[in-house]
Amino acid sequence: MTISDKIRIYELSRDLNLENKDILDAAQKLSISVKSHSSSISSEEAKKIKNLINKKNPDKTILSINKPSIKKDNFKQNKEDKSPVLSSKQGKPLKNNSNKKPLLIKPLNKPESVKKISNQLQNPNKPNIVNSSQSRANLTNTNSKPSQNFNQDKKTFVNNTPPPIKSPAKPPIQLIAKPKNINNNVKSSESSQNIARAEDKRRLSSKPDQNTNKPKTKNFNNRKNTPELVGAPIRREDPIINPNKQNNNKQNIAFKQTASNRPGSPNRPGMPNRPGLRNKPSDQGRPGSFNRQGNPNRPGSPNRPGMPNRPGLRNKPSDQGRPGSFNRQGNPNRPGSPNGPGMPNNRPGSKFNGQNSSGIRKPVSPNELLQLQKNNNSEKDKIGIKNNSKQNIEVPKQKAKAPNNRPNATPSSKKPPHRTFSNSSKKPGKTDWDDSAKLEALRSKNTQKQRQKVHIIGENDDSLTSETSGYSGEKISILSASLARPKKGKSDESKSQKTIKQFKKKKKETTRQRQKRRAMELKAAKEAKQVRPEMIIVPEDNLTVQELADKLSLESSEIIKSLFFKGITATVTQSLDLATIETVAEEFGVPVLQDDIQEAAEKTVDMIESEDIDNLIRRPPVITVMGHVDHGKTSLLDSIRESRIASGEAGGITQHIGAYQVEFEHESQKKKLTFLDTPGHEAFTAMRARGTKVTDVAVLVVAADDGCRPQTLEAISHARAAKVPIVVAINKIDKEGASPERVKQELSEKDLIAEDWGGDTVMVPVSAIKKQNIDKLLEMILLVSDVEDLQANPDRFAKGTVIEAHLDKAKGPVATLLVQNGTLKSGDVLAAGSVLGKIRAMVDEHGNRIKEAGPSFPVEALGFSEVPTAGDEFEVYPDEKTARAIVGERATDARATKLAQQMASRRVSLSSLSTQANDGELKELNLILKADVQGSVEAILGSLEQLPKNEVQVRVLLSAPGEITETDIDLAAASGSVIVGFNTSLASGAKRAADANDVDIREYEVIYKLLEDIQLAMEGLLEPDLVEESLGQAEVRATFSVGKGAIAGCYIQTGKLQRNCSLRVIRSEKVIFEGNLDSLKRVKDDVKEVNTGFECGVGCDKFSSWVEGDVIEAFKFVTKKRTLSQ
């Protein structure tokens, strides 16, 4: 009882010495809301429950409402109600039962539980009971002889015990309590059959006398108080022969004993107890039940002969004469199953069953029998008493023919007893022992179709399993009929298991396994197509090794092997040139065809389309000025601009962009010319790499006093790659020592032959400073452009090229655009390469804002999403959706192109080095070499060639004998080169120019020193290596679990440990983990480092499997200067 006047169900049951279910049943009848034995109720509700239980059980002699025990009042009412019915309807005296001799079987050992219960009995006159068989025999004798008392019955049992049962061949008796000696339960079938025959004769010749007198009831009640009396009730009417001979399994068992074996007797010859099952009491003396004379299936007694024990199930009492059921002795029909031949409907809910089902009680387990058996006159029992009059008439008919079938009913003799489902004694949905009896009925109907063995471990199953492995395992698969469901097929289970296994297997597939599987699939696919192609087409004159292998239907390893034998080391991603591809393909017998593609320098998109033909007009030419740095290119451009701009604007000219437009009067007509300042400008190089054709005419400026220089030759190659006409301007003709003819001679060696020499190249001698022949040069440019027939359509969406682009802090991405066709207007949506833009503003070369720009007009435009790439082509689209789609496709192509460039052949050339160096993908050292004599230059160049060039390339821009001049300074400043002088001097003004342009000049007199410094400079361009430096070593001496991880308690043996350093865990001389030291603590404080001789805690986020004895090696990575590798 709690402080708050609340009491729990289990406390109340303990106070009343009842079970929890008794209290719960009483609470349900009183409509008190309780859920389980731990529910709390008020003290008033507890009083109501006590009053209800006291009314039902004034003497409190019954333990449980649902327990099958013998009750005083009920037995009295049975005799009062049933005696007239039996005597009137049967017309046979009940005293004939006195002729039967009782059968007494002495138990081997008296269980201690009986002793304990006997001390608690309410009847003090009978404290010592020899065994349960005596009590039951006494009870039987009392029913048959009303004039005798209990002591006389006891003596009669002892004296009248038949000798066949006392024979040593008979099995020991099993008491109500849990059996101790299991092995003695085995019986012989012959002895049980002899007993059955003897019993049959006695039973058929005698008619049981029903008790009608009160004294008999008193004697019975006195005997009832013993715990052994909890058993099947005794039939109190004469058995009537039942024509149904097939369903008498229980009756056969009953007639194997003499009439002296009465209910309550534990002696059951030839019948072992079921292991793991509780012996259920029989219904002897219950209201509404008959006295089953001669039925050996009693609570606590050995079960039927020849019937193995059932593991996991309690022994059920026999159901003969129970209310709601016939005397089903050996009847295989079970509730809920089809009835046997000649049997009425036994199913729950049937008419007959409904009439006789109210007096059934649940069986009692051995543990429950150890407590006091208390009277409980429940409503269920009262209902059973009222229905007994009808039961007494029909039930005996089931007993008559039992003895004839018992010896031969071997299969049916193994059928366990069953009970009819009782609606009044058990609530629907509750699992009871009756449910398992229903299953027994279902299985016994078709014995050949038995369920699979399922051994259910019971309370008493520990030592009985070996004795009862036969019947129980074969017959029982589940305990409750309410839980019975068809078993899932093995095939379905196996399929589902396989599916789960496959699914888990896929989940556990590692990256390496997946790669291996894909490689195997690819190999199988390639093996399936081993047919060589007739020919392969090589686009863009290059293919990677993998692409070539795919085209030849070979493995990439075959291509690499072929290249290796040719002295070429390649990888699957390395690009191969056309010559190498042809060599490899011919080895495998496949010809190579070059794809009909325009050369790289030509434009990939034609600016003039077929729709523009009707609206074409002449457009101004685009002129590119190229040449060496010191050959007067800038002076020439300045002269052209100054001569064609009004004198009022001359002083305020500021070139904002790399392209500008000038007007020139030719043949009384004003002509516009667009000049592109490309020499030294990165835009021209980017456009050549992109393969675009921007310029219409290339002007090559060559100094008359210096002749052709390396950059002059490079400019010639640029113009030829772009396939544009070249106009040569021989500058500085006014300077002393100028020789235009020598320049023509040098150019003729490069296949540029002047017109006056019979060639087709226009060469004009000019002087930018003196402004000589400037007009003639412009006229030649116009003549050449007229021959080219340059046209465009201004009435269409604009197309053009990005000259240059940069990111402005205030304006954002800014691009210089050259319109080549159409008209560009503000608000147009355009795609420049892989960049989307919408024109927000445009300005010309003078900084004036304009709204539109026609063909060959350079403008500076704003409104791009990001900075476009110089050399990309742009095009205006009608809507943003279309432009965005085009941009996405170009972005994909751009990535592929960049990848191809990265995987290009590693053969080093001047142009490829320049391109990669500009992109920051290659370390490059630019040099300008000047020496005293040509022999020194050649020697130095030969030594530089021997330096390692795998990681850093040496590019000598200029190597010549002579002194270091200002021209060399200018070249070094433009290219970011270092000037190296060997036994030479500086020209006048060179030192000043070098300081002004911040150019590094190195002078040497010994070649070895020169080579050493150059090698050190090359190594300085290399990124330093990360080298492992050891910090210390610690040993794990303890581990601590913290949350999901673990902390290692360590002792620093050498060096020190630092937080966030790298560590390596070594166990059994093997490295099991390598990562970072994330947590370092000294006692409870976070520390940065712990030195030798101290203890600390080490934690790693990605490792927690610490084991005592692990060794932790701490280290860190430091940078180390790299050296050149061969």
From Swiss-Prot:
Biased composition (Low complexity): 93-111, 211-224, 240-252, 291-315, 327-349
Region described as Disordered: spans on this chain: 63-519
Keyword GTP-binding: yes
Record field: compositional bias (Basic and acidic residues): 70-83, 429-443
Subcellular location: Cytoplasm
Entry keyword set: Cytoplasm, GTP-binding, Initiation factor, Nucleotide-binding, Protein biosynthesis
Listed Polar residues bias regions: 116-151, 181-195, 254-264
Binding site for GTP: 627-634, 677-681, 731-734
Basic residues biased stretches: 501-517
The keyword GTP-binding belongs to this UniProt entry's keyword annotation: yes
The protein's name in its UniProt record: Translation initiation factor IF-2
